[in-house]
């Protein structure tokens, strides 16, 4: 009689401990996620602040709009504030957005105790730079060291070099146009901004980038890093990890810039006082070297100086360069604006001939030029997205809502600059709105350089560059948008406003 074959054991019999462990882990995961959702919806300190359900539960809204849709998150805020009829909305589990000018001025004031959110400002692994310093006292000390370079008087001293670098670019553009080639001013004026900033950083170092038909490597790398920032919000250790795995690897443009910084820095790093005294105007790097010697009695590292320099370059490219492109585009789109601007420039006689010394007081008081620049800042918010701050222990009252301590709080320039009550028809470029003689709220809402203690240190330099460039350009040159012209100038939020398409022009000397 044959013995029957025993049945094969089931999977549960073969791997009982593993199956039970997986089941247990799944239950733990479900309970943890479910508990977090319940806590965020019904027991969180922000539960009474209105906003999308998905935003209260997770960071999905930010991920979807900023990464999947590529930098569109901050453009949803005005609609959300309207939908919920509230000056404050919840845009994340512990993140709120303000659209209230009084609250904005409380948060972004001189001496504010609403500190920068460290997880946001250090995600690009640049936590030693002046921009990313979150400690108020440490930032104040660093700013004092550099402030002499960024006063109005110091900015005016740089005018000859600003004009020299501008004329180099215009000569290149004239040559391009004579050859029948269109000029990509989106890349060219941003490249010019790099060379302007580099002059303040490194003094007489020559041009960091050259002008060509193709985008310079350094500009390509800056754009790549900016595009990566929304991703770094979710993976903040990505760059530090990559740097630790391949510390000597840098993109081509960044590597070349660091080499320029190294060549400039090494002869100065151990004897800063002597080198500064030999020049009428120190550079940012020289002042940082001197400060390190004075406070720490030792020189800074070359890597530290290169990182600080790169942060300045990164900050200056799209703020000044992008605003110039926006101004030129909108001026050329409206013959009436171009005519009125030229009439004012011609009447001022400030730009009669190249090389004429500029009366900066008179230049700063040209009403229509200033109106064009203000409107360019408004319609092209250089930093359109959230600039997160941490609510201090006393909290913040916004209308009928109380925002508790520890909440991450943001207020965006895009929302302020496109406020329909203050700026009717906000998508239209209307410089005349800045020529009003009555008291209005426009100046309070226009904050292209932010406000308070953490406002952009380079505001005087940037404004001088904008006035000089637009004044010189439209006094001496004829510009024409290439066909087909863009119907509008659109941007996406890569921390800075990044153009969706380039502006192309032809240029020639102005006919008498």
From Swiss-Prot:
Pfam families: p450
InterPro entries xrefs: Cyt_P450, Cyt_P450_E_grp-I, Cyt_P450_sf, Cytochrome_P450_monoxygenase
GO MF annotation: an example: iron ion binding
Catalytic activity field: hancockiamide A + reduced [NADPH--hemoprotein reductase] + O2 = hancockiamide G + oxidized [NADPH--hemoprotein reductase] + 2 H2O + H(+); hancockiamide B + reduced [NADPH--hemoprotein reductase] + O2 = hancockiamide C + oxidized [NADPH--hemoprotein reductase] + 2 H2O + H(+); hancockiamide D + reduced [NADPH--hemoprotein reductase] + O2 = hancockiamide H + oxidized [NADPH--hemoprotein reductase] + 2 H2O + H(+)
UniProt entry tagged with the keyword Heme: yes
Keywords: Glycoprotein, Heme, Iron, Membrane, Metal-binding, Monooxygenase, Oxidoreductase, Transmembrane, Transmembrane helix
Name the UniProt record assigns to this protein: Cytochrome P450 monooxygenase hkm5
């Amino acid at each position: 009689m044959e013995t029957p074959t025993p049945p094969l054991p089931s999977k549960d019999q073969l791997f009982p401990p593993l199956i039970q462990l997986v089941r247990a882990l799944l239950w733990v995961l479900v309970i943890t996620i479910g508990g977090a959702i319940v806590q965020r919806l019904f027991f969180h300190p922000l539960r009474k602040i209105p906003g999308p359900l998905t935003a209260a539960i997770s960071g999905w809204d930010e991920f979807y709009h900023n990464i999947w849709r590529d930098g569109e998150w901050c453009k949803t805020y005005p609609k959300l504030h309207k939908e919920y009829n509230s000056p404050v909305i919840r845009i994340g589990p512990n993140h709120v957005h303000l659209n209230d000018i009084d609250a904005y001025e409380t948060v972004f004031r001189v001496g504010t105790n609403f500190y920068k959110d460290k997880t946001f400002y250090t995600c690009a692994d640049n936590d030693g730079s002046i921009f990313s310093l979150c400690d108020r006292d440490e930032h104040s000390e660093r700013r004092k060291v550099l402030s002499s370079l960024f006063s109005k008087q110091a900015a005016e001293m740089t005018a000859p070099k600003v004009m020299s670098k501008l004329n180099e670019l215009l000569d290149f553009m004239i040559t391009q146009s004579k050859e029948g080639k269109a000029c990509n001013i989106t890349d060219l004026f941003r490249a010019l901004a790099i060379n302007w900033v580099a002059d303040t950083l490194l003094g007489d170092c020559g041009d960091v980038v050259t002008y060509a038909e193709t985008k310079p490597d350094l500009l390509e790398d800056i754009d790549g890093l900016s595009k990566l920032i929304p991703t770094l919000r979710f993976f903040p250790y990505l760059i530090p990890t990559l740097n630790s795995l391949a510390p000597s690897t840098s993109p081509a443009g960044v590597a070349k810039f660091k080499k320029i910084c190294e060549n400039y820095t090494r002869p100065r790093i151990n004897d800063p006082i002597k080198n500064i005294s030999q020049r009428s105007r120190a550079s940012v790097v020289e002042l940082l070297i001197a400060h390190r010697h004075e406070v720490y009695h030792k020189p800074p590292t070359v890597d530290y100086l290169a990182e600080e320099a790169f942060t300045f370059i990164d900050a200056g490219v799209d703020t000044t360069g992008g605003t110039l492109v926006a101004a030129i585009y909108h001026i050329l789109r409206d013959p009436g604006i171009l005519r009125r601007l030229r009439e004012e420039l011609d009447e001022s006689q400030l730009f009669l001939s190249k090389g004429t010394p500029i009366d900066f007081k008179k230049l700063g008081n040209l009403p229509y030029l200033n109106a064009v620049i203000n409107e360019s800042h408004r319609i092209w918010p250089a930093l359109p997205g959230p600039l997160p701050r941490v609510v201090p222990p006393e909290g913040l009252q916004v209308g009928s809502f109380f925002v508790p301590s520890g909440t991450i709080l943001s207020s965006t320039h895009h929302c302020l600059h496109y406020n329909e009550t203050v700026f009717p028809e906000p998508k239209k470029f209307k410089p005349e709105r800045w020529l009003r003689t009555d008291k209005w709220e426009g100046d309070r809402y226009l904050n292209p350089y932010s406000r308070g203690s953490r406002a952009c240190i380079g505001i005087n330099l940037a404004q001088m560059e904008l006035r000089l460039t637009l004044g010189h350009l439209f006094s001496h040159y004829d510009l024409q948008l290439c066909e087909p012209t863009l119907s509008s100038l659109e941007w996406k939020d890569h921390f800075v406003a990044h153009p969706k398409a380039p502006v192309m022009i032809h240029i020639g000397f102005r006919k008498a």
